[in-house]
Swiss-Prot record:
<dbReference type="Pfam" id="PF00028">
    <property type="entry name" value="Cadherin"/>
</dbReference>
<feature type="domain" description="Cadherin 4">
    <location>
        <begin position="351"/>
        <end position="455"/>
    </location>
</feature>
<feature type="glycosylation site" description="N-linked (GlcNAc...) asparagine">
    <location>
        <position position="265"/>
    </location>
</feature>
<feature type="compositionally biased region" description="Basic and acidic residues">
    <location>
        <begin position="909"/>
        <end position="923"/>
    </location>
</feature>
<protein>
    <recommendedName>
        <fullName>Protocadherin alpha-9</fullName>
    </recommendedName>
</protein>
<dbReference type="InterPro" id="IPR015919">
    <property type="entry name" value="Cadherin-like_sf"/>
</dbReference>
<dbReference type="Pfam" id="PF15974">
    <property type="entry name" value="Cadherin_tail"/>
</dbReference>
<feature type="glycosylation site" description="N-linked (GlcNAc...) asparagine">
    <location>
        <position position="548"/>
    </location>
</feature>
<keyword id="KW-0812">Transmembrane</keyword>
<feature type="repeat" description="PXXP 5">
    <location>
        <begin position="891"/>
        <end position="894"/>
    </location>
</feature>
<dbReference type="InterPro" id="IPR020894">
    <property type="entry name" value="Cadherin_CS"/>
</dbReference>
<dbReference type="InterPro" id="IPR050174">
    <property type="entry name" value="Protocadherin/Cadherin-CA"/>
</dbReference>
<comment type="function">
    <text>Potential calcium-dependent cell-adhesion protein. May be involved in the establishment and maintenance of specific neuronal connections in the brain.</text>
</comment>
<dbReference type="Pfam" id="PF08266">
    <property type="entry name" value="Cadherin_2"/>
</dbReference>
<feature type="domain" description="Cadherin 3">
    <location>
        <begin position="243"/>
        <end position="350"/>
    </location>
</feature>
<feature type="repeat" description="PXXP 3">
    <location>
        <begin position="832"/>
        <end position="835"/>
    </location>
</feature>
<keyword id="KW-0472">Membrane</keyword>
């Protein structure tokens, strides 16, 4: 029942006051109820859930709690209906004593979200205590000679109730001698007394028995009585008289023991014993007064003998009497009022109740961490308390009610920075000097999963040798999570993806807890040079957070692949490769070539060739190129040389340890009249090598003759066209014109337009290209070397170096298989004793200048899986130092490329011949001679015909 009203005539003003108070309650956010004391168990107090705006269904889930601040379980809440009721006996006098206000302060706490409500339940007083006198009987001794209107003080009754229930009225039993003098409300210091209205006569009435009744103002009324026994004494004319009826003294509560309070003075007009006075407290004074004060019976001095406490009692009213020694003795009375002055002797008292500990680091601002109540027993400024908190912390104190504070979150928390706080709450009063008290609050910050695992690097590079054992440990990834407990428990996994037709997990795996990365199978550098993948780190928080790191695993090559020989199409019966060489060949003629590849890389794939010791004797007229594998003659062959030479060529890589392969080459020396040169593709028959060789040669001669006839006709036509353009011939550089012989195959035919452009270039001549059939004699000018000095040397006679722009073209590089690696060095020798030119090719230009044959790289438009053997007539005239060979044999093709040098600034149409990767000139000459332009127009038709053969 909220603000229950009383049914009295002043109900309307009271109702208005209650309405105003209710409006204040709503504005302050607090609830006020009232309940009478001594209410029975289960008495309804109020619908607390409804008044707080809480739904009944959420009381239990939100952990509804009721805290009565040390008042026990006087009140409880029914969580089913949200009603506040009386749980046990409430005694107002026991709770609050004689205090005018008595209330039970409750705190209602609900969670999710955390809310705190303050509820005051006022305990209404009922008239359950009757008035009580200090004693049930009081004896009075009054002399018969006392004049009328003499007053004799009495100790009044007390009522433990308050208000109207403690408002006492007195009634004296009917008699003819005395009436009762009751002080008014503004005469509280004046005691109750009997007033004599008729003279006493001891002889007539020696004793009087009166009954004093005290009645309170409660309903129903309660009463208390005391028996008054009045003894009439014989004459003692004058009673002692104090100079004041009321003495008022103020003492600080920390007054020292023995301090003089006051020295009341009484006088008696009688003489002798009738004038001697004895001082004392009244007989009905309380024991508490006797424990705090002492009165000297002779001097009347009152001193302090006990501890004074303002918080216990703010004033002491002491009845004092002075009695003479006459007979009958007469007494005088006065009252001493001792007011206790408060001093700041009580420090504040702090009580802390933690609610949300530990606090999650993502808690919202304003979250209540703890409730703090403070009490100071002093009064006024000495009892006014202010609270403060340790500075520089993410918390603050908020005053929620009188002497109540809430510790709330003021700033965002970060457990990774500070995991716990030791807070100190200081309560300081307003006294001088002020007193204070402190209390500590430990606030632990609970972790939330707000940090993802982090790797030290975003990418790691790992080097692993190939052919590793399955399951070997290759690396360990480690991620650190700044969170705690399960939020920092990191597990690792692969970010799955596919590598070709296989999944990543078939190559590597990662241990979920340790982060160790294992190779599940042997890695092969030739199959997989770089394995790039990601490892994911996830924590165990909810929701889980994660990050990825990239691993680049480079598979290092080991020398695990021996050189592999490129097998020719036809073999001899004994597995060796046979080749026939004319005895008339001179020194330096390339008669064959051993081609091998190594699947490894780097030095492990750098191949070298050498003859086996048993075959590399001085009598054998052959040698093998160290890095090219080309077999050439070391001298001119003669009749003393064995007709069949067996060569063992050892192919070795540069790995550690080196791996080798051996090729067997059978060289047959034949007379020039016995058989022409045949290629290695037709050197061996199925049943009879010699019969097959003859048949092949017949067809070969017929084909060569046909091709040669066509070539002669082409040359005649070309000569006629050249003669018709004689004015432009003078523009050619000095020297014998170089003829171009085209093969009937047509793959290496050389157009007249190309010939014209080579010849008409500015400055000195560049290297020209000559193609001819191996079965025919070389064209005039290509086999004779008398005119070569002017074509291969400049005006100073110094040998020219090869064009530095010789490179693999994109088409040549694309044709090479990924497992075939370039040899580290190919050697092109200009001549015996001359400087060498290194070529980064699989099979570089021949080091023997006599033959002038080269083979293109593997995949450069020829059959890479065939053996290539070429021989040609030796040139009796050797090139000078630094000169380049003028012919190259194209493997797999019956054509020889002849290279001659022209001036470096000549403009060449590179669309008409193969340059083996030579860079195309990016800038053409802007100025050409007018005659060249005219000649090119005339030869346009002829060049079109020639290009169609290519």
């Amino acid at each position: 029942m909220l603000y229950s009203s009383r049914g009295d005539p002043e109900g309307q003003p009271l109702l208005l006051s209650l309405l105003i108070l209710a409006m204040w309650v709503v504005g302050s956010g607090q609830l006020h109820y009232s309940v009478p004391e001594e209410a029975e168990h289960g008495t309804f107090v109020g619908r607390i859930a409804q008044d707080l705006g809480l739904e009944l269904a959420e009381l239990v889930p939100r952990l509804f709690q009721l805290d009565s601040k040390g008042r026990g379980d006087l009140l409880e809440v029914n969580l089913q209906n949200g009603i506040l009721f009386v749980n046990s006996r409430i005694d107002r006098e026991e709770l609050c004593g004689r205090s005018a206000e008595c209330s039970i302060h409750l705190e209602v706490i609900v969670d999710r979200p955390l809310q705190v409500f303050h509820v005051d339940v006022e305990v209404k007083d009922i008239n359950d205590n009757p008035p009580v006198f200090p004693a049930t009987q009081k004896n009075l001794f009054i002399a018969e000679s006392r004049p009328l209107d003499s007053r004799f003080p009495l100790e009044g009754a007390s009522d433990a109730d308050i208000g109207e229930n403690a408002l006492l009225t007195y009634r004296l039993s009917p008699n003819e001698y005395f009436f009762l003098d009751v002080p008014t409300s503004n005469q509280q210091v004046k005691p109750l007394g009997l007033v004599l209205r008729k003279l006493l006569d001891r002889e007539e009435t020696p004793e009087l028995h009166l009954l004093l009744t005290a009645t309170d103002g409660g309903k129903p009324e309660l009463t208390g009585t005391v028996q008054l026994l009045i003894t009439v004494l014989d004459n003692n004319d004058n009673a002692p008289v104090f100079d004041r009826t009321l003495y008022t003294v103020k003492l600080p509560e920390n007054v020292s023991i023995g301090t003089l309070v006051i020295h009341p003075n009484a006088s008696d007009l009688d003489e002798g014993l009738n004038g001697d006075i004895i001082y004392s407290f009244s007989s009905d004074v309380s024991p508490d007064i006797k424990s705090k004060f002492h009165m000297d019976p002779l001097s009347g001095a009152i001193t302090v003998i006990g501890h004074m406490d303002f918080e216990e009692s703010r004033a002491h009213k002491i009845p004092v009497e002075a009695v003479d020694k006459g007979f009958p003795p007469l007494a005088g009375h006065c009252t001493l009022l001792v007011e206790v002055v408060d001093v700041n002797d009580n420090a504040p008292q702090l009580t802390i109740k933690t609610l949300s500990v530990p606090v999650k680091e993502d808690a919202q601002l304003g979250t209540v961490i703890a409730l703090i109540s403070v009490i100071d027993l002093d009064a006024d400024a000495n009892g006014q308390v202010t609270c403060s908190l340790t500075p520089h912390v993410p918390f603050k104190l908020v005053s929620t009610y009188k002497n109540y504070y809430s510790l709330v979150l003021d700033r965002a928390l970060d457990r990774e920075s500070v995991s716990a706080y030791e807070l100190v709450v200081t309560a300081r009063d307003g006294g001088s000097p002020s007193l204070w008290a402190t209390a500590r609050v430990s606030v632990e910050v609970a972790d939330v999963n707000d940090n993802a695992p982090a790797f030290a690097q975003s990418e790691y590079t790992v080097f692993v040798k190939e052919n590793n054992p399955p399951g070997c440990h290759i690396f360990t990834v480690s991620a650190r999570d700044a969170d705690a407990q399960e939020n920092a428990l990191v597990s690792y996994s692969l970010v799955e993806r596919r590598l070709g037709e296989r999944s990543l997990s078939s190559y590597v795996s990662v241990h979920a807890e340790s982060g160790k990365v294992y190779a599940l199978q042997p890695l092969d550098h030739e199959e997989l040079e770089l394995l790039q993948f990601q490892v994911s780190a996830r924590d165990a928080g909810v929701p889980p957070l994660g990050s990825n790191v990239t691993l680049q695993v480079f598979v290092l090559d080991e020398n695990d692949n021996a050189p592999a020989l490129l097998t020719p199409r036809m073999r001899g019966t004994d597995g060796a490769v046979s080749e026939m060489v004319l005895r008339s060949v001179g020194a330096g003629v390339v008669v064959g070539k051993v081609r091998a590849v190594d699947a490894d890389s780097g030095y492990n794939a750098w191949l070298s060739y050498e003859l086996q010791p048993e075959t590399a004797s001085a009598s054998i007229p052959f040698r093998v190129g160290l890095y090219t594998g080309e077999i050439s003659t070391t001298r001119a062959l003669d009749e003393t040389d064995a007709p069949r030479q067996r060569l063992l060529v050892l192919v070795k890589d540069h790995g550690e340890p080196a791996l080798t392969a051996t090729a067997t080459v059978l060289v047959s020396l034949v007379e020039s009249g016995q058989a022409p040169k045949s290629s290695s593709r037709a050197s061996v028959g199925a049943t009879g090598p010699e019969v097959t060789l003859v048949d092949v040669n017949v067809y070969l001669i017929i084909a060569i003759c046909a091709v040669s006839s066509l070539l002669v006709l082409t040359l005649l036509l070309y000569t006629v066209l050249r003669c018709s353009a004689m004015p432009t011939e003078g523009e050619c550089a000095p020297g014998k014109p170089t003829l171009v012989c085209s093969s009937a195959v047509g793959s290496w035919s050389y157009s007249q337009q190309r010939r014209q452009r080579v010849c008409s270039g500015e400055g000195k001549q560049k290297t020209d290209l000559m193609a001819f059939s191996p079965g025919l004699s070389p064209c005039a000018g290509s086999t004779e070397r008398t005119g070569e000095p002017s074509a291969s040397s400049d005006s100073t006679g110094k040998p020219r170096q090869p064009n530095p722009d010789w490179r693999y073209s994109a088409s040549l590089r694309a044709g090479m298989h990924s497992s075939v690696h370039l040899e580290e060095a190919g050697i092109l020798r200009a001549g015996p004793g001359g400087p060498d030119q290194q070529w980064p090719t699989v099979s570089s230009a021949t080091p023997e200048p006599e033959a002038g044959e080269v083979s293109p790289p593997v995949g450069a438009g020829v059959n890479s899986n065939s053996w290539t053997f070429k021989y040609g007539p030796g040139n009796p005239k050797q090139s000078g130092p630094g000169e380049l060979p003028d012919k190259f044999i194209i493997p797999g093709s019956p054509a020889i490329i002849s290279i001659r040098q022209e001036p470096t600034n000549s403009q060449i149409d590179k669309s008409d011949f193969i340059t083996f990767g030579k860079k195309e000139e990016t800038k053409k000459k802007k100025k050409k001679k007018k005659g060249n332009k005219t000649q090119e127009k005339k030869e346009k038709g002829n060049s079109t015909t020639d290009n169609s053969d290519q």
